[in-house]
C-alpha cells in the first residue's frame, strides 16, 4: 500500500492499494493504516481517499467495515494500433514556448478534475524531467494562432510488449463542438504506433459519457477499473 506524498484537493490523506496486492488481509491493513495516520491531527469532516487498482467487484464489501465507501471509478481502456488517420495537422511541444498556453488550456479543460486540474508550472516542470517525457509525443493543435487542444502521450517501456498511453488529452472549451476530440486522440495513437507500439491505452472517468462514446468509436474496450473510496474523519 502506497501513501501519496501530496494528496489531491479536498483530501488530507490518500493511499493506494497497488495492482496485484493480496486481498486476504486488506481489511486489517487498511485499519492499521488509519490507526497509524494519527487521525487526531485531522479535523472532524476531513476526508481520506483510498484507491484500489484493478478493483474487483467485492472490494467494497471487503473493506466496508473500515468505513470507506466507493465514490469514483477510473477505467482503463485499450485498443489495437494503428487507428484511422487523423485529419488534424499537429506540431510537437516546444520547450520555452508552449508552457503558458498549455497550462492555460489544461486549467480550462480540467477545472473539474481533482488531479489534472491542479497541474501548475512547478508540477509540470517535474513531469518534464521524468525519463519518459517525450517532446515528439506531446502534440499540439492550433486554430487561429491559438492552442485549441493537445494530446500528451507516454510510452511504458517496462511493459512487455511496451504500451502506449494517451497520458492527457484535452480540447479548449472555447473549441468544443467542433469534432476535435476524436482526431486529436487518433493523432496521438498513431504517433505511438509510429514508435512501434501495438496497443494504445488511456484512463477515463466512468461517468464521462461523451468521452467514452468517442473512445468506443475509435476502437477502445474496457481493460480494468481503478476504484476510489473515501472515509470521513
Located regions from the model:
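Conserved acetyl-CoA binding element of GNAT-fold acetyltransferases
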Residues: 8-27, 162-173
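A short beta-loop-alpha structural element at the N-terminal edge
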Residues: 89-104
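Acyl-donor-binding surface of acyltransferase catalytic domains
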Residues: 7, 17-89, 229-231
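Conserved acetyl-CoA-binding loop-helix of GNAT-fold acetyltransferases
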Residues: 22-39, 168-171, 177-194, 212-217
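Short, high-confidence coil segments that cap the C-terminus of an alpha-helix
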Residues: 43-45, 136, 197
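A conserved beta-strand-loop-helix scaffold within acyl/acetyltransferase catalytic domains
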Residues: 1-8, 115-169
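Active-site/acyl-donor-binding loops of N-acyltransferases
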Residues: 64-85, 186, 194-233
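Conserved hydrophobic beta-strand within the GNAT/NAT acetyltransferase core sheet
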Residues: 48-52, 166, 200-204
Amino acid at each position: 500500500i502506497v501513501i501519496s506524498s501530496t494528496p489531491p484537493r479536498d483530501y488530507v490523506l490518500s493511499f493506494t492499494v497497488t495492482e496485484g496486492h493480496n486481498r486476504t488481509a486488506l481489511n486489517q491493513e487498511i485499519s492499521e493504516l488509519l490507526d497509524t495516520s494519527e487521525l487526531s491531527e485531522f479535523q472532524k469532516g476531513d476526508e481520506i481517499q483510498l484507491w484500489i487498482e484493478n478493483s474487483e467487484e467485492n472490494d467494497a464489501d471487503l473493506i466496508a467495515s473500515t468505513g470507506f465507501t466507493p465514490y469514483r471509478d477510473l477505467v482503463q481502456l485499450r485498443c489495437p494500433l494503428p487507428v484511422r488517420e487523423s485529419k488534424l495537422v499537429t506540431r510537437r511541444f516546444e520547450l520555452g514556448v508552449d508552457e503558458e498556453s498549455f497550462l492555460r488550456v489544461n486549467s480550462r479543460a480540467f477545472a473539474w478534475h481533482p488531479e489534472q486540474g491542479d497541474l501548475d508550472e512547478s508540477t509540470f516542470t517535474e513531469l518534464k524531467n521524468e525519463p519518459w517525457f517525450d517532446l515528439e509525443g506531446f502534440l499540439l493543435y492550433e486554430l487561429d494562432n491559438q492552442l485549441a487542444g493537445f494530446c500528451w502521450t507516454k510510452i511504458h517501456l517496462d511493459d512487455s510488449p511496451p504500451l502506449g498511453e494517451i497520458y492527457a488529452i484535452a480540447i479548449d472549451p472555447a473549441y468544443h463542438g467542433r469534432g476535435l476530440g476524436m482526431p486529436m486522440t487518433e493523432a496521438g495513437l498513431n504517433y505511438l504506433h509510429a514508435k512501434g507500439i501495438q496497443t494504445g491505452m488511456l484512463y477515463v472517468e466512468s461517468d464521462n459519457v461523451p468521452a467514452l462514446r468517442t473512445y468506443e468509436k475509435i476502437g477502445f474496450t474496457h481493460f480494468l477499473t481503478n476504484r476510489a473510496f473515501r472515509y470521513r474523519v
